[in-house]
Structures are given as structure tokens and as C-alpha cells.
Amino acid sequence: MPDGDDQKSLSQSIKGRLQEGVQNSVFRDKGLLDPDAVIDEDRIVGRDDQLDDIITYLRPALQGNRPPNMLLYGPSGTGKSLIINAVCQQVLELATSQGDRFGVIKINCQTIKSHDRAVYRLVKNAAEEAGVDVGVPESGISTDQKLDRFYEILSNNFDSVIIILDEVDLLVGRQRDPNDEPAYSKLLYQLSRASQLGRIEGHVSVAALTNDPRFMEDLDGRAESSFNPQDVVFPDYDANQLQAILERRRDAYQDNVLEDGIIPISAAFAAQDHGDARKAIDLFRKAGEIADRAEEDTVREAHVRDAQKEAERDRTLTQMQGLSTQKKLSLYATAIVPVYSQRNLNAVPSTVAYRVYQYLTDILDAAEKSRDSYLRYMNEAETYNFVTSEKRGRGYGSGVHKEYTFVDDPEVVAETLQTDFRLEGAEHEEDLVKSVVNAQIDDFFDGN
């Protein structure tokens, strides 16, 4: 263990490095690049219609009336949470100024596994919003008792409440039978009926946020009738809108640290991924973090490209967590074909990839599966959105083969798969593997 002087020196060194990192950072206000931050109205882009609708629907809360229930739907990163949170924040401030008790109770349903857990999370968040004790344990009592406590908190502390259920379609619950009512259906019925049944003295409205345009089709008939929401549709952002979103967060960075073209290329990458503003903002932030790590005072295009690769690698790694070794090996064999090819390959012939797979099983001392098994593994890779496939003919009498195109950069896929210790041996034999890949490509296309 270090003595007193060494410990003091270490503390000073850590403190100095922390201060230096803050002082030399390219960021001025990094919080502006948090996709979940509630932002000012002048930073909102391309959502005028949705903003108008939600303002109209929530205005009754300031007039002593109940706002309608709402269903906000559209792909991820299209501004659903951003807009509802921004409007609710303004309603809260105006209501407080005129002496009304308005509450906003939010939960994200992504990680909530059951109806009971969702109700407890509502109780907990309502208690926090009201500044009172939760009053019930997480387990050991019935869901109805937790609901009673939730209604009690709302009645005692608020005149009007909006309950925001983000990613509500993920609150499926434990369905023992495909015909069982999903947990979100039961919860929506209970919340939307609470005022009508006299369970709550004030006004209660529910805003459900989902990516699924067919969400209402899965609701129980009673829940659908009781919830009866006003729909607000959020389409994808286009590249110009994404660019404008980033421009309005430019002041997250210090003056003159952004190289020309940083914002357009960040927007272009995100536009390729279904116009997701959340991903555009993440990419814009990660580029700055990479510049900070490299102790550079300018955010360059190379940092954005590195950030895009990091994002792809993280996404790929997450998706690959549950894949077996054979599935990873099949995907790896396919990915290295365009990476190692001396030709410009846009698509990978399954014939070539399978032969490379056979070679890899040999050098890695892994079991060799049949061609049909390889094709089955790649079909599964397609369902995970790693690749797309197309059947191709090679002329009369030459048969048909599949060709695979990678959704993300195949080099990123290959590098990510190499992190599995069972595939490390392939990296050690890189020169040999390259020669095999190109020999198989030449044989396929030239018949040598």
C-alpha cells in the first residue's frame, strides 16, 4: 500500500488530470447532447404539427378540465418523448404560477416485466413527484393495494395529472397463453377508468408512447373503449431536419472546435438509419468524446466516422450476445469475404462464404456443419438484421445461389466477432485466411 506522501501525490495527480480534462474539453455544455434532456422550444425542429396537437390536447389542464388521453406513435428517435416532455414542462410551470397542482408521472416500460412492477413504479414516481413517502413495499402486498396507494397520492397532491407511459408496447407481462391480455392493456384500462370510477378526485390523462402503429389492435376491447386516445403521429426525420436539430445544439461545443462538415456528416449517417434524431445526437456527442480522449482541440470528420464505427460495434455486440459459436463462425466467415477481398464486392456469394467457413472450422478445430446448416444460420442472421439476402442465377445450367449484403460495415462485424476468444485463432492466421478468401473468390467468378 502507498504511504501518506505517495497517497497525497496520487490524489493530486488524479485531481490535476480531472481538472485538465474539464478545462481542455471541446464541450461547453455536454448536457445539451443528452437525447433525454428537456430542451427549449427554439431547439425543436420539424415537429410543428405534433407540437400544435399536444399543446391543444393539454391546454384544458390549465382551464380546470381533463385533457384527453393520447397515443403518440412513430419510429424510435422521432421526438415523441421530447415533445410531450417539453409541453408538459411548460404546462407545469404555468399551472404552478396560477396556483394549480399539476403533476407529470413518467415511467419507461422497456425494463418493466409485469403489471405489478409497473404499478409499483408509478407509485414510486408519483410519491417522488409529490414529495411524500411511497407508503407501500415493492413486494408482499397485492397489486390492488399498490394501485390504491397510487390513487391516494394523486388525489391528495394533484388537481390534474398526466401519466406518460413510454415504450408502452414493451410492457407485455407474463402471458401464459397467446390469448392472454397483455399487461399494458390492463394498466391502460385501470388508469383511464380511475377518474370515471371515482378512484381519483382530480383529472387523470394518459399519454402512451409506442413505436408500433398497430398498438391499438392488441388492446382488450374494454381497454380500447376506455382509453380512446387522440392519435399523434411522428414520422422519420429527413437529413435536412436532422442537420437542423444538430445545428441547434451546436452550442454544446466550445466556439470554433467543430471542423466544417461535422454536422452534415453526422446527420447523413443518422438519416441512413431511419432518420433517428437520438442516434444523430449520440453520434454528434461521441465524436466530441473521441476528440477529448485523443486530447485534440478540434472535432474532425474522422472522429465522426470513428464514432459511427463505435456505435455499430456496440449495436452489433449487443445483438450477438446470444449467438452460438457456430452462428458466430458462419457470420464471421461471411463478413471477412468483402473485408479481405481484392475485388470490390458489394454482396457475398454463399458458395464462397461457406468454403471460407469450412477452412475456418479446420484452423480453429471446430465442428464443421453442413451447407444447409450454414444457410440456416445465415437466415437467422438476416432476422437479426445483420444481413440481407437475394437469390442470384449464374446463367443457364449454373444454378442459383444466395448473396448476402451486410447492413452495417462488414469490417465492424468481423472485428466485433473477433473479440470472442473462440475466434481469436483466425486473426492469428490472417495472411492465410486472406489467401483462402481470394482463391475462393477467383474460383467462383473466374472458374480457375
Question: Predicted regions span which residues?
Answer:
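A short, basic N-terminal segment
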Residues: 1-68
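Mid-core helix/loop region of P-loop NTP-binding domains shared across ATPases and GTPases
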Residues: 10-15, 114-120, 128-218, 222-229, ...
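Walker A/P-loop nucleotide-binding motif
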Residues: 65-86, 90
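Conserved catalytic segments around the Walker B and adjacent sensor/switch elements
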Residues: 69-71, 94-111
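Conserved AAA+ ATPase "sensor/coupling" helix adjacent to the nucleotide-binding pocket
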Residues: 122-126, 244-255
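C-terminal helical "lid" subdomain and adjoining coupling/linker elements of P-loop NTPases
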Residues: 256, 265-326, 341-346, 364-370, ...
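Short amphipathic alpha-helical interface segments
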Residues: 325-359
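Terminal-proximal interaction/regulatory segments of ATP-powered molecular machines
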Residues: 347-448
